Amino acid sequence: PYATQPREGRGKDAADWYRINPHRLHLGVVGFEGLNPAELTEIDQTLDLMDGVIRSSFTTEGEKIAVTTACDPDADRFTATIEGKKHLPIAIRFAYPTGAHTDDASNWAADEKHSTELVASTEQSATLLRTIDTARYYVRLDWTGKATIAQKGRNHFTLTPEEDRWTIAAHFTPQETKATAEQQDILAVEGAATAFWNNFWMKGGVVDFSHCTDPRAKELERRVVLSQYLLAVQCAGPTPPQETGLTYNSWFGKFHLEMIYWHQAQFALYGHEDLLLRTLKWYHSAADGARHIAERQGFEGLRWMKMTDPDAMEAPSKVGSFLIWQQPHLIHLAELVYRATKDEAVLKNYYDLVMKTAEFMYSFATYDEANDRYILKGIIAAQETLRASENVNPPMELSSWHYGLSTAQLWRERMGEPRVAEWDTLLAKLSPLAKDAEGKLYLASEDATDSYTNIRFISDHPAVTGALGMYPESRLLDKEIMNNTIDKIFEVWNWDETW
């Protein structure tokens, strides 16, 4: 059985509930109290990529305010050092979650449904207890100099300084951090952030287009380097990132395993495999859930879910439950880490997961006895306009199956184990990419013979290109035909309906 979405009745209600829950919480908003953006002048803000700090300044009522913000690289804590003769109060506000599909996860009109309690304080610290339904977490505030904390509402506090220069720190944690007279060393956070980011840039690779003659090169370089920073900030946590990172909430805050490749494969290629390993550890804890899905559906090994959460629960979906292109990602990412490190510990740590992932891939493929080949069917392709009931042999998935099983065999050899004969048989007999009648273009799938005239097949992801764009060249495809296919896609694709 597949975890789908019934259209009505209790089944629909249950599926909707499991899609929404658990959902992401907004932990809190810390900012200046009562400022009117329209009244601010001389606004300037600079992100210092090298040191990992944001320097901001503005003028309000004739007084200049300067702020330096940094995040602790080892804890869910940030600091802000504020300078100015006008002693602006800081607001610490909390919202109730929305449970919505796409938003900022903040419902500011439900104060009565959650609470914030000041449970401890000293002259330079305070601990707030947040209670939202059955969820509890703490916010530890520390500051330098003299400041006064006050409760302005059920879930609204202010901290008003008496100094021209002071620093505030906010630490979000599931466990209470006792407020004591001995202040936490908040001034060290900025230095720790700078050390982390200096090491990030000096240790890893950075693109350099300075010798390019194309006038667009400088802007492209800026975007690529900024993306390296943004991905490190937003996509290097203990779980795979949601599609919109940390800035915004999408899909109820849940993450999609087919997307981890886009967000995190680059870490291993830029020399930051340690950041990728932070997330890959999650697959160990998720293995039981993946095993249960495979068993429930009659397959071997581990079937990695599409839409999930930190506890690896499979979200019901009329589309996601039929996707398979997330399946080889664990093998792909583990291989990239091994190539980057040549560390046998990586092989030992991920060997079982790689084998169990490949076991599912072998058991999922169907042997077509009439044509003496293996096929992939009963799936929705990465190009989600293809229907599970019709779709046979989408090209990117074929390439991913060939790559995943080939790499799993390579891991066996590295570990001194024999190759699995059945996997080699599948690799030898896996269907090549389907071509049009003239043999000049690759199709969206074997059944989609009108791939470049039917609007359904020229919308959504142009996933056929991923067969070579994401995976190495193999016997399944011909580069000349792929080049023809790319040219055709640029000629006819419905770009207004693609993503």
Where does each model-flagged region fall?
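Acidic/polar, glycine-enriched structural segments that form the non-catalytic walls/loops
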Residues: 1-254, 273, 284-291
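Primarily short, surface-exposed interaction patches in extracytoplasmic proteins
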Residues: 208-217, 221, 239-253, 263, ...
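Structural recognition of the beta-strand scaffold that forms the well-ordered cores
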Residues: 231, 274-278, 284, 291-296, ...
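Carbohydrate-binding/catalytic loop surfaces
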Residues: 244-254, 298-319, 372-396, 440-455
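Active-site core of glycosidic bond-cleaving carbohydrate-active enzymes
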Residues: 256-289, 310-313, 323-340, 344, ...
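Acidic/histidine-rich catalytic neighborhood
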Residues: 356, 360-411
